């Protein structure tokens, strides 16, 4: 005894490195990248449940650290250091004020926050989150303070409309169930284009006071699945998540919208079925709980190790906690532990998980956007939405004859400015600098007219954008006309003898002249007609002559003129295709991965898949058997045949006849 009194127990530091408090978003920050915010962790030690006195296996050192007996070495203790430690005599008020209350302010800034209660079964998680009427827990205290904050913000005269809504769900045996509407069944977890996690179909109840919250929350809490085990008479058999959404809408320009979410999560405790004696449905529930908590540990380890893939999708729990761990939320993890020695292994496991969790880094940011009505597109008249030719036809004869260019140009330019206003609202400052340089250059050359920068910025950008679009449209029309002229000239340059040897069904129109009408206003393409039968030869590639009539409407004449036009189409004989298919099948069965990569639409991955399938199942009976290879679909096989049969058939023949 004297030796032990003189020799102090050795202490092993466990997770002693602690960083500073998490930083919130800085309003005047220059960098657009969200600041880092570490997951803050707290440990709460519940009192003894039994009357029998026994020495505890956990002892608090100060407000941030504790020590646990080391079962491997009797004279050593394991020391843990966290952001906060609440001992046996700590109250619900101490836990709430010390860890949870500071993060509520972030919700009014449009940021997310999460509070998770973690620990083994019977450690007091539900008591910490819910409490009792005499000692309310985190959830009722947080809702009471949050509603009070919204009332204070509204009373200060800020130009924001604030609304609060709640949702309540549980994850029971990997099923997401709505506690506010138990008849809704299993819900799915989705992710939007911005990476936000959402649950379509989840009931949302607006609340304006704490009494309204109790009216919805208390009946829903009775829908949660609980059961009795040897270690806990009211053991939670599911993970419960209370989601509180705070929406703010600005009444004045620029009509911003902010959304902050608060996740209050009561996790089910991990269980040792040898000690709990679970059987039947309890055993199945315990397996689902332990599996989800195991995946939760894998997610924390992957985040700490910086792995490229984080296994969020391996369980419904981690999928829902994707924003809380490694996401954009201010997260608080409250680990609940028991002092009894029979919970020693569970306590060590919970403390180790908590120590790893405090190294997880989140990046909170403000969820702010413009309200939908502020982004509504400007509705243009029907004539503004039509093209130049259609707009001209849409006009009446009186409107077309009496309208002046000056009167029609002004509405068109105004509508173009309005339609492009939203697209150019966030123009790059570098573009403005280029415009300033352009104006100085025009001024030095003696340019006359209205200076470019005398107009407002947004209208100036709209004008420049409109001019660029018109120039591009003119260039496209010029290129299209050149292509049409070149096509007609190439058809006229065909050998007359070849034209005579080619039988045609369509007779040339007598009214069609050899010259090309320069101003083409409208072209109507008639259905194709086949004009040459397939040759009896079965070992060649043939050119089939195709023809169609085209109506040309002259800008000077109202009558339409029909013109016969010819073009050529390739047709391959069936025997040549059969030889190409045979060669392709031989290459698929005998060729190496390098030979397969020489084919069209076959890369390194597909070549390896084909070789592997061939080694397992033997040679292909036909080319269409590629559909049986995992990773190659029927459409891919069809495009593969089209791309390779023509090239293989052409390689076996010198050319068309």
From Swiss-Prot:
GO molecular function annotations of the record: ATP binding; ATP hydrolysis activity; DNA binding; microtubule binding; microtubule motor activity
One GO process term, biological-process aspect: mitotic metaphase chromosome alignment
Phosphoserine PTM positions: 404, 419, 444, 537, 554, 573
Binding site for ATP: 119-126
CDD domains tied to this protein: KISc_KID_like
Region (Disordered), start-end ranges: 1-33, 388-415
Covalent cross-link Glycyl lysine isopeptide (Lys-Gly) (interchain with G-Cter in SUMO2), where: 457
GO cellular component: chromatin; cytoplasm; cytosol; kinesin complex; microtubule; mitotic spindle; nuclear speck; spindle
Subcellular location per the Swiss-Prot or TrEMBL entry: Nucleus; Cytoplasm, Cytoskeleton
Entry's family note: Belongs to the TRAFAC class myosin-kinesin ATPase superfamily. Kinesin family.
Name of the protein in question: Kinesin-like protein KIF22
Organism of derivation: Rattus norvegicus (Rat)
Lineage summary: Eukaryota, Metazoa, Chordata, Craniata, Vertebrata
């Amino acid at each position: 005894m004297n030796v032990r009194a003189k020799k102090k127990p050795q202490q092993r530091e466990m997770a002693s490195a602690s960083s500073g408090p998490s930083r919130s978003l800085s309003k005047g920050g220059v960098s657009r990248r969200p600041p880092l915010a570490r997951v803050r962790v707290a440990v709460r030690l519940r009192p003894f449940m039994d009357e029998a006195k026994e020495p505890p296996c956990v002892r608090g050192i100060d407000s941030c650290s504790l020590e646990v007996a080391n079962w491997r070495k009797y004279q050593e203790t394991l020391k843990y250091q966290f952001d906060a430690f609440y001992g046996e005599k700590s109250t619900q008020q101490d836990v709430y004020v010390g860890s949870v209350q500071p993060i509520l302010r972030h919700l009014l800034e449009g940021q997310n926050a999460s509070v998770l209660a973690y620990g083994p079964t019977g450690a007091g998680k539900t008591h910490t989150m819910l409490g009792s009427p005499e000692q309310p827990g985190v959830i009722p205290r947080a809702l009471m303070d949050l509603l009070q904050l919204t009332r204070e913000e509204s009373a200060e005269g800020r130009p924001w409309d604030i609304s609060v809504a709640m949702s309540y769900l549980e994850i029971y045996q990997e099923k997401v169930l709505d506690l506010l509407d138990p008849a809704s069944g299993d819900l799915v977890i989705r992710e939007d284009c911005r990476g936000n996690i959402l649950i379509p179909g989840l009931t949302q109840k607006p609340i304006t006071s704490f009494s309204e919250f109790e009216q919805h929350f208390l009946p829903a809490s009775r829908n949660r699945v609980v059961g009795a085990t040897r270690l806990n008479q009211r053991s939670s058999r599911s993970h419960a998540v209370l989601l509180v959404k705070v929406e703010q809408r600005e009444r004045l320009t620029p009509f911003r919208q902010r959304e902050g979410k608060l996740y209050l999560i009561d996790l089910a405790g991990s269980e040792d079925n040898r000690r709990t004696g679970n059987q039947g449905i309890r055993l199945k529930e315990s397996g689902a709980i332990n599996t989800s908590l195991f995946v939760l540990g894998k997610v924390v380890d992957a985040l700490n190790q910086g792995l490229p893939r984080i296994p969020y999708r391996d369980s419904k729990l981690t999928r829902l906690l994707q924003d809380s761990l490694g996401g954009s939320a201010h997260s608080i993890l409250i680990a609940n532990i028991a002092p009894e020695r029979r919970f020693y292994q569970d306590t060590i496991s919970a403390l180790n998980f908590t120590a790893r969790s405090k190294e997880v880094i989140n990046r909170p940011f403000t969820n702010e956007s413009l309200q939908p009505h502020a982004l509504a597109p400007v509705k243009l008249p029907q004539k503004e939405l039509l093209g130049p030719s259609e707009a001209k036809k849409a006009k009446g004869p009186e409107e077309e004859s009496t309208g002046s260019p000056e009167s029609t140009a002004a509405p068109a330019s105004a509508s173009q400015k309005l339609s492009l206003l939203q697209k150019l609202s966030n123009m790059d400052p570098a573009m403005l600098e280029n415009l300033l340089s352009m104006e100085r250059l025009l001024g030095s050359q003696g340019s006359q007219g209205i200076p470019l920068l005398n107009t407002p910025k947004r209208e100036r950008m709209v004008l420049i954008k409109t001019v660029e679009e018109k120039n591009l449209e003119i260039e496209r029309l010029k290129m299209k006309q050149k292509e049409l002229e070149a096509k007609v000239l190439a058809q006229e340059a065909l050998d007359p003898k070849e034209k005579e040897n080619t039988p045609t069904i369509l007779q040339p129109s007598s009214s069609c002249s050899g010259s090309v009408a320069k101003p083409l206003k409208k072209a109507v393409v008639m259905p194709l007609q086949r004009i040459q039968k397939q040759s009896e030869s079965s070992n060649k590639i043939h050119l089939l002559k195709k023809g169609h009539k085209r109506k040309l409407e002259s800008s000077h004449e109202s009558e339409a003129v029909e013109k016969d036009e010819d073009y050529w189409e390739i047709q391959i004989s069936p025997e040549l295709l059969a030889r190409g298919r045979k060669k392709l099948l031989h290459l698929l069965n005998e060729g190496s991965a390098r030979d397969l990569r020489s084919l069209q639409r076959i890369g390194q991955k597909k070549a390896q898949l084909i070789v592997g399938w061939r080694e397992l199942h033997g040679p292909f009976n036909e080319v269409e058997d590629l559909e049986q290879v995992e990773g190659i679909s029927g459409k891919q096989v069809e495009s593969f045949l089209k791309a390779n049969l023509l090239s293989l058939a052409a390689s076996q023949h010198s050319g068309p006849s």
